[in-house]
């Protein structure tokens, strides 16, 4: 399917679904940007769809999963639902948690600016590739299945998505709000570091600009869902399934997946430390033991960055 605008100053955006389940891309144009000819569509396993996006456009794309729509096109999605009750989002934004691809085309010096953001959480692996442009045109995104590494307190939709710490706890220090609304005051948290370790080129928190925003000039773009594997599974060990339109509530997951790796071990170590820091650790230990354990755990965590 090719959706076109008139005029030559446009970029071709191609959406590719390498997941082993359908994905429903959602589209939201930024303030002052013209709406595209679609705001949402279904992308079956193995399919690709393209559309033209005019110069000067800004907005975001995301993938919805676990969707169920009836014969009249009414329904909802288990993750990243846009609230329209339809396949087309019609100006609706992605409900967190959602992996977001964000673009500003033809900005400063005619450059395109783009990023993949986990600030609103994560639901699907996603990669942006710039094609045929000039400049660095770095590929960016998150290829890791963060649902398998998601701390239990951040899990949503039965393990099909992973909340940000801001969404989960609402604290100003996690949301970079109030007194923390500046780069100097809002620093990476242990939770955002889990996201950053797994996806180094993605935004992990609100002020993660330096290593997360990229530029290209005159390029076309490919947005790929599940780029690394034909079978991306949730933390429950099964692929996302379509849900009934009346069932899109977020449900806390149980335990971690059966697979284990160093990154996942680090994630759960950091999760325990974060709980301890905010007083939610499930363990009650003498202060001397806590001190020794905390020292060892922090040392182990820091070694992962060396």
What do these predicted ranges mean?
Residues 1-306:
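Extracellular low-complexity, O-glycosylation-prone Ser/Thr/Pro/Gly-rich "stalks"
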């Amino acid at each position: 399917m090719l959706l076109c605008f008139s005029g030559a100053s446009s970029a071709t955006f191609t959406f590719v679904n390498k997941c082993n389940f359908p994905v429903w891309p959602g589209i939201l144009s930024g303030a002052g940007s013209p709406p595209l000819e679609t705001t949402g569509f279904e992308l079956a396993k193995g399919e690709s769809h393209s559309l033209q996006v005019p110069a000067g456009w800004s907005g975001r794309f995301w993938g919805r999963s676990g969707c169920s729509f009836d014969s009249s096109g009414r329904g909802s999605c288990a993750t990243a639902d846009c609230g329209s009750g339809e396949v087309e989002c019609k100006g609706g934004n992605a409900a967190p948690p959602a992996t977001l691809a964000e673009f500003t085309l033809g900005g400063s010096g005619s450059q395109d600016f783009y990023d993949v953001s986990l600030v609103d959480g994560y639901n699907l692996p996603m990669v942006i590739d710039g094609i045929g442009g000039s400049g660095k045109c770095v590929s960016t995104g998150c290829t890791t299945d963060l649902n398998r590494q998601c701390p239990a307190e951040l899990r949503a939709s039965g393990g099909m998505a992973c909340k940000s710490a801001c969404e989960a706890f609402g604290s100003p220090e996690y949301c970079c709000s109030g007194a923390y609304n500046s780069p100097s005051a809002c620093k990476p948290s242990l939770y955002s570091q889990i996201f950053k370790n797994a996806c180094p080129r993605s935004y992990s928190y609100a002020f993660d600009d330096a290593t997360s925003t990229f530029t290209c000039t005159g390029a076309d773009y490919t947005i790929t869902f599940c780029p690394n594997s034909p079978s991306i599974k949730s933390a429950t060990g099964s692929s996302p399934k379509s849900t009934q339109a009346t069932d899109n509530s977020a449900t806390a997951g149980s335990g971690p997946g059966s697979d284990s790796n160093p990154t996942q071990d680090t994630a759960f170590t950091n999760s325990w430390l974060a709980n301890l820091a905010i007083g939610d650790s499930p363990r009650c230990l003498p202060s001397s033991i806590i001190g020794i354990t905390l020292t060892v755990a922090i040392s182990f965590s820091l070694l992962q960055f060396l």
